[in-house]
């Protein structure tokens, strides 16, 4: 038992010990003791288990003993509960750079980068290997056969025919026999015999010269494809233009100077050597200049370097830290008076001052000129200006030899020559003489008859000539001819040939290509020093120099006490000049200097003979006629080599030939040319030259078209000038005239210089003549190259020369006509055979030979030189339409459109908010009638009373009888016009009416008569009338919900209406109740006569309203009463329900023409009309002036000719048929079109149906669409002059250009002008009338750059510019000085006097500006003086009859209105949450607009903007609108990852960060308005809209926006009282983050917005909120609290 007790004690002790560490130890111990001892268990044994053997004395309790020693340490207790989180520590120091992190996820795709700069041109590559032989080309078509040429000239005389047969034997003569007759002496030569009979046709003469090329024939059918032709000769090119100069190379070290003696023999230039080995490294260069200070931010602190070597002992350290604080010193003297403090902050706003005195405003003074705008971009090259006035006469030009001009036109045929002298008579018996000189050519014979048509064989002999073909178009130039034979070998002679006589001066040649570099010349004498060149670019930095020897250790420096930073020193003296820079690149060519004065005559010295020149090219053959253009026949076979011709006259020097192949040098001793001697004196004048030969006759000009016959003139009076005829077709060329070449005439006197020409086209100008050699000038700066001038006008013909010496033998003339048959010759013996005759005329061209066989492939020719630069090609045809381009980036926001037409009636809206409590109502209307009283006694018949009040509306009667069926309803007479009613409230918009019928197409106009002549340009017309309004703009954005209006005052009751129509007599009523008994009963009397009317009784009291009677039977319809008098206007009625659409009415008579109304609201765009018929062809323009002759073409198609003078503008054609392109994007708003004319009257409406039940007329139908505009009325008479006010009116809008004036009378004929140069493009013609709207095309290419717009308004002040470059160092002397203390601030100066008012500036040009912002509400002005009475207006159209309304009683006085004065000065900020600017509420002027800034983050700290305050509406947007500055007076911009956050619009979320213009549609716009009182937001915390307090009105309703966070843990919030906490629209992502440094914006994933939620009132203090995730927009909105912004209005 004891053991159990001990065990229990131990257990309890252990339990108590283990629990004693807790706070409940006492209780547990007591509990445990009770558990042991108090368990109620009895121990069995004596004394209850106690030891009773010993006496138990209970002594008294002793006093408390001393405290025991401390017990041993207890065991460690269990871990305590975690404590609360401590406060955040201070921000730690910047840690070491961490290891590079893992690669992040791929970021969003960045925007496309800016295209790089174009790379430098590469080094030209080596020539490529020759390509493989190309495939044979396609077979060409046979060319069409040319027209037969003109008949050749008459052939030369054929050789004499064979002798004729012997004649018949003559009669025998008489025999005379004389004896002894001696033979007589030979008699005189007999007379020439009679001409013999014509001989037989001689053999064919030699072939005549080639005829002129015929006109091209009609295009024949394409021939069979020919075989492939032989390979052509390699083309001959021209050396290409010199390339751009290369980059300047590094400056080489100077080479050794060698003087080379001239060699004894010809030197040859060797081949280029191989590239040398790299040179040795040069000496170190001089030290470079100090570089410019770098740009960029200071870098991050670098990584600690390795420990350096032990340094020298340092100098004395700086003073130590200040010591401990000393003891309190003695009291000092009172200080001096302080300096005047700076100007204080501006004081609070004062009370409004009294209203100012109204002064008549003076004329507006012009403000000071604004800041200069930024320079605009260079405009495009302007149009060519008009020709300047004629310049002064220039000096006579010097004649220089130029190139041979093109062949002149064929001259007119010469006159027939004089008959030759008679020849010596021939002897019949002599041998035939030598052939005589060819006779002069005879006159041309008459043209032969037209031959028969030829046969159609392709290869055949020449057929008979065909009939005259129609004149063909000018054919293309022929291709390049075959390569000519190789010329004769040139002579090699070391001596130059004798100098030929000088040729006549040629025309100026074109500028030759740049020649090769000449041999190096001798060193010239030292020239005068040139002017200083332009400053070259800085040289490249020098290489690092070799390290110098270590310097000696410097002396120990003085100890510097001051630690104040000194001021910036002054600029030091200029350093020594730097090393010369690298040579600059070539400057551009300078302007040509003016012609210098002639120099003084040079000293004469014998010139050393110059070196031998290269052999000159052979001159062209002398005076042959001009070569005709190439013919169209096939090339003939090469002829045999002819005999060498007679040497011709020395030809004019031809143009420089192409550079030949490298020649073989013939070894001969060549001496280096000596130096040029000084110019010799002028020689004596040479003898007078022989007269020059007369030029060959030119081709004949083409005849013009025959003009139209003029009107027959009268005998004396000259008729009016006739119409100008069209230019005729060119006539056929006449026969070539003959005339011997005349002697050359003397040179003509120099002509007067022509006027200065318009600058010519640089591609076609000629090189001017070389000037006389002037003195060597100082080399000028090379100017830009000028444009070559036009050739001068042709000088007048020279004085005719003296008769020249006998000319050389003329050329062989053309064959003459066959002579008249001569008399028969004497019979004589057959002569000896004659000398062979001259070659015959050339025969007709033979048929083309058969195509030859394919030749052997030719060797690859050497590469030809580059061809000349081609002439500009013709403009290509317009390309096919490309596919539609990608949509462009959104354009900038356009101006506000015109107000759109009212939209159709929308569906019924949600019920509105409960209105504000109304004012106390007026007394109610009369009550219902009381119960029926007892019947009274029957009274006497009263006199008729006054007209009673209008009875209550009777009950609806029974349906009437069926009316008769009207066959044709006649139109009633129109009623008298009622007075116009007051304007009702605007009704709901009716449904859109049916569109009108399509108008008929108009007839095409006829041609007008031709004008007499081109009129002078009319003067500028008066500005036209303003056009009609343009088409409606696109629908504007939805406006703000309007504020609920104030309750209107109760309207006055209307006046009583006119009497109604007489009612139909009712049926007899039922029998009345029985009356009371009478006092006396008399017998009934006979029926009396009707009594006379009694006097009117007194007014009885108004009886109570009777009960409505029982409905009587339907009476017969009454006649219409007379029209009532018009009552006063009634109050506007409530809006009726829209009536059913009525049947269309009959067509009314056309009304009188109304005055021109104000421009209406633009109607909706009409249905696209049908395509117009194609317009008639316009009249032919006047024939342009004849263009100058073009240069010969190099290829098949010549260059485009110069642009002719534009013809007169043709009549305007009708619109063409519509294009087939799909509609393009909507164009910009076009200019208003002219008003349409009235359409034809519509067809008569359908006959109405027969009425069965005549219902009450329905309410009026909806208003139909507006009709077409009527034609413009005639302008009214001029109005009366207006009164002259003190204020000057604003300048009117710029007028439209007036119509062109009528043609003026014909001017006098002008003098013949010199031929002008090619004209430039004409100026832009006047703008035509706007055509009808065409179909939408594809999006066009970007338009030309527009004209510069008007200068914009002055922009806001820009951001501070970057810090300027450091100034030049100041001059300092050697003594450093401690800077002085800053001076005391000066006293504030007195206020300057007001300046004198400036002169009034001139009125600025320009059209009327845009309307300015609304000004603040001004004080009521003094009433103006009454204006002059206007003239009586025209009668208006008949108005609709107004309904008569009864006049109401006078209402109670209204509440006191706002007096004039200012608003309260409170600011209200509206954020649209779209990209459109919000509008201010009614009566609140707008102060500015801008972009909605939510908050900024800089240095990872956020700064919030309250959206209800004006600071959240920044006028200008920037992704980083701030910079940060530090104590070192340095500011940094865009150097850290700072951000800005802006309220966003409703644009769809983008996939990539936005940049530049793409950001604009995503930023919300805002406006700051001036409000009369402070606006307050109220929040409901549920789905209902909270009401505004009494006497407050609503501004807008929205959703409760609470706070936001962005990058990191930074963000901000809105005060719930602020209007910024009530956003009109809920967005889960309501703001946009812009990364300032990158200039991009995006909706990033770590942005959160916080909104007040809805809370049910019964769950305010209940269980924890249930978590929820809302993904649908509607569910999100239902969870967000609603709010309303209110402002006090009374």
From Swiss-Prot:
<feature type="compositionally biased region" description="Pro residues">
    <location>
        <begin position="1220"/>
        <end position="1243"/>
    </location>
</feature>
<dbReference type="InterPro" id="IPR008160">
    <property type="entry name" value="Collagen"/>
</dbReference>
<keyword id="KW-0732">Signal</keyword>
<feature type="short sequence motif" description="Cell attachment site">
    <location>
        <begin position="724"/>
        <end position="726"/>
    </location>
</feature>
<dbReference type="InterPro" id="IPR001442">
    <property type="entry name" value="Collagen_IV_NC"/>
</dbReference>
<feature type="compositionally biased region" description="Pro residues">
    <location>
        <begin position="66"/>
        <end position="75"/>
    </location>
</feature>
<feature type="region of interest" description="Disordered">
    <location>
        <begin position="469"/>
        <end position="1457"/>
    </location>
</feature>
<keyword id="KW-0176">Collagen</keyword>
<feature type="compositionally biased region" description="Basic and acidic residues">
    <location>
        <begin position="586"/>
        <end position="607"/>
    </location>
</feature>
<feature type="glycosylation site" description="N-linked (GlcNAc...) asparagine">
    <location>
        <position position="669"/>
    </location>
</feature>
<feature type="compositionally biased region" description="Gly residues">
    <location>
        <begin position="199"/>
        <end position="208"/>
    </location>
</feature>
<comment type="function">
    <text>Type IV collagen is the major structural component of glomerular basement membranes (GBM), forming a 'chicken-wire' meshwork together with laminins, proteoglycans and entactin/nidogen.</text>
</comment>
<keyword id="KW-1015">Disulfide bond</keyword>
<comment type="subunit">
    <text>There are six type IV collagen isoforms, alpha 1(IV)-alpha 6(IV), each of which can form a triple helix structure with 2 other chains to generate type IV collagen network. The alpha 3(IV) chain forms a triple helical protomer with alpha 4(IV) and alpha 5(IV); this triple helical structure dimerizes through NC1-NC1 domain interactions such that the alpha 3(IV), alpha 4(IV) and alpha 5(IV) chains of one protomer connect with the alpha 5(IV), alpha 4(IV) and alpha 3(IV) chains of the opposite protomer, respectively. Associates with LAMB2 at the neuromuscular junction and in GBM.</text>
</comment>
<feature type="compositionally biased region" description="Gly residues">
    <location>
        <begin position="149"/>
        <end position="164"/>
    </location>
</feature>
<comment type="similarity">
    <text>Belongs to the type IV collagen family.</text>
</comment>
<feature type="region of interest" description="Disordered">
    <location>
        <begin position="187"/>
        <end position="258"/>
    </location>
</feature>
<keyword id="KW-0272">Extracellular matrix</keyword>
<feature type="compositionally biased region" description="Pro residues">
    <location>
        <begin position="1443"/>
        <end position="1452"/>
    </location>
</feature>
<feature type="short sequence motif" description="Cell attachment site">
    <location>
        <begin position="189"/>
        <end position="191"/>
    </location>
</feature>
<keyword id="KW-0677">Repeat</keyword>
<dbReference type="InterPro" id="IPR016187">
    <property type="entry name" value="CTDL_fold"/>
</dbReference>
<dbReference type="GO" id="GO:0005576">
    <property type="term" value="C:extracellular region"/>
</dbReference>
<keyword id="KW-0023">Alport syndrome</keyword>
<dbReference type="Pfam" id="PF01413">
    <property type="entry name" value="C4"/>
</dbReference>
<dbReference type="GO" id="GO:0005604">
    <property type="term" value="C:basement membrane"/>
</dbReference>
<feature type="disulfide bond">
    <location>
        <begin position="1525"/>
        <end position="1531"/>
    </location>
</feature>
<feature type="compositionally biased region" description="Low complexity">
    <location>
        <begin position="644"/>
        <end position="655"/>
    </location>
</feature>
<feature type="compositionally biased region" description="Pro residues">
    <location>
        <begin position="1256"/>
        <end position="1280"/>
    </location>
</feature>
<feature type="compositionally biased region" description="Pro residues">
    <location>
        <begin position="1119"/>
        <end position="1131"/>
    </location>
</feature>
<feature type="disulfide bond">
    <location>
        <begin position="1634"/>
        <end position="1641"/>
    </location>
</feature>
<feature type="signal peptide">
    <location>
        <begin position="1"/>
        <end position="38"/>
    </location>
</feature>
<keyword id="KW-0084">Basement membrane</keyword>
<feature type="short sequence motif" description="Cell attachment site">
    <location>
        <begin position="989"/>
        <end position="991"/>
    </location>
</feature>
<feature type="compositionally biased region" description="Low complexity">
    <location>
        <begin position="866"/>
        <end position="880"/>
    </location>
</feature>
<feature type="compositionally biased region" description="Pro residues">
    <location>
        <begin position="529"/>
        <end position="540"/>
    </location>
</feature>
<feature type="compositionally biased region" description="Pro residues">
    <location>
        <begin position="1338"/>
        <end position="1353"/>
    </location>
</feature>
<dbReference type="GO" id="GO:0060090">
    <property type="term" value="F:molecular adaptor activity"/>
</dbReference>
<dbReference type="GO" id="GO:0062023">
    <property type="term" value="C:collagen-containing extracellular matrix"/>
</dbReference>
<feature type="compositionally biased region" description="Low complexity">
    <location>
        <begin position="907"/>
        <end position="917"/>
    </location>
</feature>
<dbReference type="InterPro" id="IPR050149">
    <property type="entry name" value="Collagen_superfamily"/>
</dbReference>
<feature type="compositionally biased region" description="Low complexity">
    <location>
        <begin position="1108"/>
        <end position="1117"/>
    </location>
</feature>
């Amino acid at each position: 038992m004891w053991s159990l007790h001990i065990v229990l004690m131990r257990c309890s002790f252990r339990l108590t010990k283990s629990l004693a560490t807790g706070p409940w130890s006492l209780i547990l111990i007591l509990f445990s003791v009770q558990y042991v001892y108090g368990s109620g268990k009895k121990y069995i044994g004596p004394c209850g288990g106690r030891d009773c053997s010993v006496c138990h004395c209970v002594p008294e309790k002793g006093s408390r003993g001393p405290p025991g020693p401390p017990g041993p340490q207890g065991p460690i207790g269990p871990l305590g509960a975690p404590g609360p989180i401590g406060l955040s520590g201070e921000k730690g120091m910047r840690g070491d750079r961490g290891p590079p992190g893992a690669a992040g996820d791929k970021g969003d795709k960045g925007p496309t980068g800016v295209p790089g700069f174009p790379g430098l041109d590469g080094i030209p590559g080596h020539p490529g290997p020759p390509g493989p032989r190309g495939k044979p080309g396609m077979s060409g078509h046979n060319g069409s056969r040319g027209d037969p040429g003109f008949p050749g000239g008459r052939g030369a005389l054929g050789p004499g025919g064979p002798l004729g047969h012997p004649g018949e034997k003559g009669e025998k003569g008489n025999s005379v026999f004389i004896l002894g007759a001696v033979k007589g002496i030979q008699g005189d030569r007999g007379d020439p015999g009679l001409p013999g009979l014509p001989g037989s046709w001689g053999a064919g003469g030699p072939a005549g010269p080639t005829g002129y090329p015929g006109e091209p024939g009609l295009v024949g059918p394409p021939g069979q494809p020919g075989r492939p032709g032989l390979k052509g000769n390699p083309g001959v090119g021209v050396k290409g233009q010199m390339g751009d100069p290369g980059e300047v190379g590094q400056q080489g070290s100077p080479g050794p100077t060698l003087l080379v003696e001239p060699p004894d023999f010809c030197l040859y230039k060797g081949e280029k050597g191989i590239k040398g080995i790299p040179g040795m490294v040069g000496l170190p260069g001089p030290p470079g200049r100090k570089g410019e200070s770098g740009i960029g931010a200071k870098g991050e602190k670098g990584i600690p370097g390795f420990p350096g070597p032990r340094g020298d002992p340092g100098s004395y350290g700086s003073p130590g830290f200040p010591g401990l604080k000393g003891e309190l010193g003695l009291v000092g003297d009172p200080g001096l008076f302080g300096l005047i403090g700076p100007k204080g902050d501006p004081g609070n706003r004062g009370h409004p001052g009294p209203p100012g005195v109204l002064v008549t405003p003076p004329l507006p003074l012009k403000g000071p000129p604004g800041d200069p705008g930024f320079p605009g971009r260079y405009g495009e090259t302007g149009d060519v200006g008009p020709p300047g006035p004629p310049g002064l006469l220039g000096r006579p030009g010097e004649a220089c030899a130029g190139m041979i001009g093109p062949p002149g036109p064929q001259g007119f045929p010469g006159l027939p020559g004089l008959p030759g002298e008679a020849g010596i008579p021939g002897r019949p018996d002599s041998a035939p003489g030598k052939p005589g000189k060819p006779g002069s050519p005879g006159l041309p014979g008459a043209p032969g008859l037209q031959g028969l048509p030829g046969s159609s064989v392709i290869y055949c002999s020449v057929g008979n000539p065909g009939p005259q073909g129609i004149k063909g178009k000018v054919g293309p130039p022929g291709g390049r001819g075959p390569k000519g034979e190789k010329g004769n070998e040139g002579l090699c002679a070391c001596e130059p040939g004798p100098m030929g006589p000088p040729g006549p001066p040629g025309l100026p040649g074109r500028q030759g290509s740049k020649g090769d570099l000449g041999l190096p010349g001798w060193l010239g004498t030292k020239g005068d020093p040139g002017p200083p060149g332009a400053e070259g670019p800085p040289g490249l930095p020098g290489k690092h120099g070799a390290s110098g020897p270590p310097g000696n250790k410097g002396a120990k420096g003085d100890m510097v006490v001051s630690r104040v930073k000194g001021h910036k020193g002054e600029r030091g003296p200029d350093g020594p000049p730097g090393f010369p820079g690298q040579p600059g690149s070539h400057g551009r060519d300078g302007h040509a200097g003016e012609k210098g004065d002639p120099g003084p005559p040079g000293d004469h010295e014998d010139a050393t003979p110059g070196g031998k020149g290269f052999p000159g090219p052979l001159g062209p053959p002398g005076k042959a006629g001009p070569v005709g253009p190439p013919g169209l026949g096939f090339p003939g076979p090469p002829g045999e080599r002819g005999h060498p011709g007679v040497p011709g006259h020395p030809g004019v020097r031809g143009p420089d030939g192409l550079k030949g192949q490298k020649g073989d040098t013939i070894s001969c001793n060549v001496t280096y040319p000596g130096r040029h001697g000084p110019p010799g004196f002028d020689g004596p004048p040479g003898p007078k030259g022989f007269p020059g030969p007369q030029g060959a006759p030119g081709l004949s000009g083409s005849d013009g078209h025959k003009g139209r016959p003029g009107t027959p003139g009268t005998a004396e009076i000259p008729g009016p000038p006739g119409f100008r005829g069209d230019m005729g077709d060119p006539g056929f060329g006449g026969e070539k005239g003959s005339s011997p070449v005349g002697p050359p005439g003397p040179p003509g006197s120099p002509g007067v210089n022509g006027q200065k020409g318009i600058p010519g086209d640089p591609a076609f100008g000629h090189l001017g003549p070389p000037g006389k050699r002037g003195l060597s000038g100082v080399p000028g700066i090379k100017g830009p190259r000028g444009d070559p001038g036009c050739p001068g006008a042709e000088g007048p013909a020279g004085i005719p020369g003296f008769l020249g010496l006998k000319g050389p033998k003329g050329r062989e003339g053309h064959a003459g006509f066959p002579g008249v048959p001569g008399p028969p010759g004497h019979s004589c013996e057959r002569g000896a055979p004659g000398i062979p005759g001259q070659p015959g005329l050339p025969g007709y061209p033979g048929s083309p030979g058969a195509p030859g066989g394919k030749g052997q492939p030719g060797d690859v020719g050497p590469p030809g030189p580059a061809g000349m630069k081609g002439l500009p090609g013709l403009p290509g045809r317009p390309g096919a339409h490309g596919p539609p381009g990608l949509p462009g980036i959104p354009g900038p926001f356009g101006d506000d459109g015109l107000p759109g037409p009212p939209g159709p009636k929308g569906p019924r809206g949600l019920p509105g908010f409960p209105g504000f409590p109304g004012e106390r109502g007026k007394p109610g209307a009369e009550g219902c009638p009381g119960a029926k009283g007892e019947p009274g006694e029957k009274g006497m018949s009263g006199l008729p009373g006054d007209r009673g009040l209008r009875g209550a509306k009777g009950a609806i009667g029974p349906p009437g009888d069926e009316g008769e069926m009207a066959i044709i309803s006649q139109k009633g007479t129109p009623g008298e016009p009622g007075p116009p009613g007051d304007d009702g409230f605007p009704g709901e918009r009716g449904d859109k009416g049916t569109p009108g019928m399509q108008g008929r197409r108009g007839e095409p106009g006829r041609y007008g008569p031709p004008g007499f002549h081109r009129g002078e340009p009319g003067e500028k017309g008066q500005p036209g009338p303003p056009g009609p309004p343009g088409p409606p703009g696109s629908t504007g954005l939805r406006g703000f919900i309007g504020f609920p209006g104030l309750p209107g005052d109760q309207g006055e009751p209307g006046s009583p209406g006119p009497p109604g129509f007489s009612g139909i007599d009712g049926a007899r009523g039922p029998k009345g109740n029985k009356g009371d008994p009478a006092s006396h009963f008399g017998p009934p009397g006979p029926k009396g006569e009707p009594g006379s009317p009694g006097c009117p009784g007194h007014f009885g009291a108004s009886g109570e309203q009777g009960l409505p009677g029982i409905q009587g039977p339907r009476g017969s319809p009454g006649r219409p009463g007379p029209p009532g008098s018009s009552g006063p206007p009634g109050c506007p009625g409530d809006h009726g329900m829209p009536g059913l659409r009525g049947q269309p009415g009959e067509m009314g008579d056309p009304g009188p023409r109304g005055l021109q109304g104000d421009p209406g609201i633009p109607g909706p765009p009409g249905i696209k009309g049908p395509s117009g018929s194609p317009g008639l062809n316009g009249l032919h323009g006047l024939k342009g002036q004849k263009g100058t002759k073009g240069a010969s073409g190099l290829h098949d198609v010549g260059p485009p000719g110069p642009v002719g003078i534009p013809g007169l503008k043709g009549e305007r054609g009708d619109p063409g048929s519509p294009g087939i392109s799909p509609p393009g994007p909507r164009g910009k708003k076009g200019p208003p079109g002219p008003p349409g004319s009235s359409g034809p009257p519509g067809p008569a409406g359908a006959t109405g149906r027969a009425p069965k039940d005549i219902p009450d007329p329905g309410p009026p139908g909806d208003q139909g669409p507006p009709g077409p505009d009527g034609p413009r009325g005639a302008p009214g008479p001029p109005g009366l002059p207006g009164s002259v006010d003190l204020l000057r009116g604003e300048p009117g809008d710029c007028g439209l250009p007036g119509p062109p004036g009528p043609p003026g009378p014909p001017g006098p004929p002008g003098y013949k002008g010199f031929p002008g140069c090619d004209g430039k493009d004409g100026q832009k013609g006047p703008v035509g009338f706007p055509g009808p709207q065409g179909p939408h095309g594809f999006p066009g290419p970007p338009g030309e750059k527009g004209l510069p717009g008007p200068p914009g308004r002055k922009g806001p002040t820009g951001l501070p510019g970057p810090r300027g470059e450091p100034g030049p160092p100041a001059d300092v002397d050697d003594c450093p000085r401690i800077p002085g203390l800053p001076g005391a601030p000066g006293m504030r100066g007195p206020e300057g006097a007001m300046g004198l008012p400036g002169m009034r500036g001139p009125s600025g040009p320009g059209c009327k500006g845009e309307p300015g912002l609304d000004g603040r509400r001004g004080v009521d002005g003094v009433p103006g003086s009454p204006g002059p009475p206007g003239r009586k207006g025209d009668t208006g159209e008949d108005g609709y009859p107004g309904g008569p309304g009864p006049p109401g009683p006078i209402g109670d006085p209204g509440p006191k209105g706002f007096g004039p004065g200012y608003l309260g000065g409170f600011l209200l900020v509206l954020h649209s949450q779209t990209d459109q600017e919000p509008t201010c509420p009614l009566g609140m002027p707008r102060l500015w607009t801008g972009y909605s800034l939510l908050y900024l983050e800089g240095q990872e700290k956020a700064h919030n903007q309250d959206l209800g305050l004006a600071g959240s509406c920044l006028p200008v947007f920037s992704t980083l609108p701030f910079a940060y500055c530090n104590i070192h007076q340095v500011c940094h911009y865009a150097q850290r990852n700072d951000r800005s956050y802006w309220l966003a619009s409703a644009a769809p979320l983008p996939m990539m960060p936005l940049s530049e213009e793409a950001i604009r549609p995503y930023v919300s716009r805002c406006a700051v308005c001036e409000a009369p009182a402070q606006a307050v937001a109220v929040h409901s915390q549920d789905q209902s809209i909270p009401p505004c307090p009494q006497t407050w009105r609503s501004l807008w309703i929205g959703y409760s926006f609470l706070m936001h966070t962005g990058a990191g843990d930074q963000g901000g919030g809105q005060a719930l009282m602020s209007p910024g906490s009530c956003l009109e629209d809920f967005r889960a992502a309501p703001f946009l983050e812009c990364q300032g440094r990158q200039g991009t914006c995006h909706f990033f994933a770590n942005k959160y917005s916080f909104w007040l939620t809805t809370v049910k009132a019964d769950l305010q203090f209940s269980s924890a909120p249930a978590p929820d995730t809302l993904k649908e927009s509607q569910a999100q909105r239902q969870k967000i609290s609603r709010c309303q912004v209110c402002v006090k209005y009374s």
